[in-house]
A protein has these predicted regions:
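Positively charged n-region of N-terminal signal peptides that target proteins for export
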Residues: 1-4
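Hydrophobic helical h-region of N-terminal Sec-dependent signal peptides
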Residues: 6-14
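C-terminal motif of bacterial Sec signal peptides marking the signal peptidase cleavage site
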Residues: 15-19
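Protease-labile, long low-complexity intrinsically disordered regions enriched in Pro/Ser/Thr
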Residues: 23-207
Length: 207
């Protein structure tokens, strides 16, 4: 079947008065990008990251890349040790800049409902969305408002991802945020979900 290879790199930017939520000066700190792999049948998969920055934490250990045995239910197994994982994790620091010219201004108290709807439209399953929300909600809901903007190249250009064999569907959702004391006007974005077909890889994270 002809591969769809849908690349949807989506950066959710929640921005406050001085920069991304987890940043220092011009340095952004991508937090918890995690990668799920769902092949059609059990197979060995190698994942490498071309990151424009410095990796500060990876699990399992990154080394020169990560090779796992992936199963259709998302279970990943280290072929050398037999240890099982449900995702691959990394964090790092980068000077990448994100585009806030379009997005959404969302009240902190409305964050959970907004993310449930947005992540569904962006193609995440309920389980994937739940894990995203559980991690990011405590950082966002206490702010009066958050500016949220979904991007493509702003994230993928600084964090190139190579998966071998290549997935038929690739979804990358990335969240960088900054809290606001008052609402702002921003050009709204149109969110669309890719069709999840055949071997699917899903990544989410933020900064």
């Amino acid at each position: 079947m002809k591969k769809l290879l849908l690349l949807l790199a989506l950066t959710l930017l929640a921005a406050g008065l001085a920069g991304c939520g987890n940043s220092s000066g011009n340095v952004a700190v991508p937090e918890k990008p995690v990668l799920y792999l769902y092949p059609e049948e059990e197979m060995e998969v190698t994942v490498t990251l071309d990151f424009d920055g410095t990796l500060t934490s990876t699990y399992p250990a990154y080394g020169d890349g990560r090779t796992v045995t992936a199963r259709p239910d998302g279970t990943l197994t280290n072929p050398a040790t037999g240890r099982e994982y449900y995702c691959l994790f990394w964090e790092g620091i980068t000077e990448a800049e994100y585009d806030f010219s379009a997005g959404f201004c969302v009240a902190g108290e409305d964050t959970a409902a907004f993310l449930e709807d947005a992540l569904d439209r962006l193609g995440l399953t309920e389980r994937e969305a739940d894990e995203f929300i559980i991690y990011w909600l405590p950082k966002l809901e206490g702010n009066p408002y958050n500016l949220l903007s979904f991007q493509t190249e702003a994230y993928t250009d600084s964090a190139g991802l190579t998966i071998d064999p290549a997935p038929d569907t690739l979804i990358r959702v990335f969240l960088a945020w900054k809290g606001l004391d008052a609402p702002v006007e921003v050009e709204p974005q149109t969110l669309t979900a890719p069709e999840r077909a055949d071997f699917t890889a899903v990544e989410w994270g933020g900064a």
